[in-house]
Amino acid sequence: MSEIHSSNAHFVEKYKDVLYFSSFFVPLTSNLWQLHIMRTKGEYIEMLRKHMSVLKQQFGIRSMCIFGSVARDEQGSDSDVDVCVEMEPDIYVLVALKQFLEKLFGCSVDVVRRHRNMNKLLEEQIERDALYVF
């Protein structure tokens, strides 16, 4: 837990359950994506579905999809995974989610929270590419 955000005691105290669970559940090194194994979109979706109860209960995610190069089968060995979620607007939970997914996948992850005022071009791209996990 201390490696995640040791300088911010408020963050750690407020989200200790999520951070502890994340660290315990997927105990991998923080820079594991250097050893990134390229996966298919189906493999990423399967991994997320296996962790669906964790994602819903620990992070409060109502829906989740993958978009971008992975969803279009255009990813390369250095690609990140783009994930869009519907959840309450909480930056600390969003950061913890990003860290959880990066440890789970072993690569860089970009997390976008869907909301009413989001950039329309981004929203259109997400809808065009979206592969819904739940």
Question: Where are each of the predicted segments found?
Answer:
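Accessible peptide chain termini
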Residues: 1-2, 131
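Extreme N-terminal basic, low-complexity initiation segments
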Residues: 2-11
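Catalytic core of pol beta-like nucleotidyltransferases
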Residues: 10-63, 71-77, 87-134
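Short, well-ordered beta-strand segments
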Residues: 65, 82-84
